[in-house]
Amino acid sequence: VNNMAGPSASFSGVAIPGIPFQVAFTNAIAQRDEMDVFHAINGVHRFYQDIDPVWPYLQGFLTAYVSIEETCNAYYWNQTINFYQAGAGCANTGEIQGVVYHEYGHGITEHILGDQGTQGIGEGNSDIIANYITGESIIGRGFYLDNCVTGIRNSENTLQYPEDLNGSIHHDGQIIAGFHWDSWQELQAGLPAEE
């Protein structure tokens, strides 16, 4: 995780093979968005390692940039995930787990499809990854500083293909995300809680 607004977090210690190594982030060595992005990236890795521990994408390298001097957005590009500072009514996007999961999801989509697809496929697939990990249909809850409830998108929706396509990838992506969300809810309803 690289801090674009100042020195990046620094931690040193001795790692011994075969023994878990604890990285103790504190406010003294890192700022909040650095810690939150680091934690969220590791959460995505754990989520997918539980599904497929040897999946090649998880063995790769992903770089994160936080506190970019822009506001109200985040993005994935070329094996990097990038998060903007707070401002203009928006929170620091590196401090919103759902946004971090979503941007990481673009890397997964690119790995599987080779690009982000068309008609919002990359956005919808990235949203549903965040939905699965957070367990809620809202993407980016807390994105707007004056509204910590609705977030930026909701995968629990009634949008349908092709009639609800409007050409905006974030809107159109809600169609496939809605399909996945509804399917996941039905699957969960049919399984015992422990599964």
Indicate residue ranges for each PLM-predicted region.
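Active-site-proximal alpha-helical
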Residues: 152-195
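Post-HExxH zinc-binding segment in Zn-dependent metallohydrolases
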Residues: 119-161
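Surface-exposed patches in mature extracellular/periplasmic domains of secreted proteins
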Residues: 52-66, 115-121, 137-145, 191-195
